[in-house]
Swiss-Prot record:
The keyword ATP-binding does not apply. Its cofactor is Mg(2+). This is Uracil phosphoribosyltransferase. 5-phospho-alpha-D-ribose 1-diphosphate binds at residues 76, 101, 128-136, 197. It comes from the Bacteria. The gene is upp. NCBIfam families: PRK00129.1, upp. Pathway: Pyrimidine metabolism; UMP biosynthesis via salvage pathway; UMP from uracil: step 1/1. The keyword Protein biosynthesis does not apply. One of its GO terms (molecular function) is GTP binding.
Length: 206
């Protein structure tokens, strides 16, 4: 399933991120806020346990998240999305995965992977601001599937149609959440109109 957001706050904040004049601090702030806005849809089907609590007035049955949640940023740009979700889900664990493109074969290769033990039978949420060709994201999903999570969701801010089709083709069982579906990839595989190199803009390394 692919869900493309249509929300005025997301559109406003994403426009600010796209501007070439936006400095790194503001870029990170808007990335965090958009991630939090997207979290409402991403987490709406999580299961709950009933628990008894005591309010200042009386006892009652409340709710507690039942699911094990693992946030998995694709290094390095995905790191900019972690804090927003971690604030909303403080019990979430965090894994990390690094993918690079082999210059000779043009195929994505894993260079780093560290996952928490509770990923098995848990709910994996993969984070990456950009979905361009879909190669790195598809490879990350393939690796994460070996840990046998209960569900896998992929969150990105800006996607090219080519990248979206790649994931839908290779992983039709994955839920994909996109803040904006852009026009295309250019000859250098940058998303058009896009927002530039998200990693450089997050960390100020342009």
């Amino acid at each position: 399933m692919t869900f493309v957001f249509d929300h005025p706050l997301i559109k406003d904040k994403l426009t600010r991120m796209r501007k070439i004049q936006t400095e790194s601090t503001k870029f990170r702030d808007n990335l965090k806020e958009i991630t939090q806005l997207m979290a409402y849809e991403v987490t709406k089907d999580l299961e709950l346990d009933r628990i008894e609590i005591e309010t200042p007035i009386t006892k009652m049955l409340g709710y507690k998240l039942k699911e094990k949640i693992v946030l998995i940023p694709i290094l390095r740009a995905g790191l900019g999305m972690v804090d927003g979700l971690k604030e909303l889900i403080p019990t979430a664990s965090i894994g990390h995965i690094g993918i690079y493109r082999d210059e000779e074969t043009a195929q994505p290769k894993e260079y780093y992977c560290k996952m928490p033990a509770n990923l098995t039978n848990g709910n994996a949420i993969i984070l990456d601001p950009m979905l361009a060709t879909g190669g790195s994201a598809s490879k990350a999903i393939e690796i994460i599937k070996t840990y046998r999570p209960k569900t896998i969701s992929f969150i990105c801010l800006v996607a090219a149609p080519e990248g979206l089709k790649e994931i839908e083709k290779n992983h039709p069982d994955i839920n994909i959440y996109v803040a904006a579906l852009d026009e295309k990839l250019n000859e250098k595989y940058y998303i058009v109109p896009g927002l530039g190199d998200a990693g450089d803009r997050i960390f100020g390394t342009k």
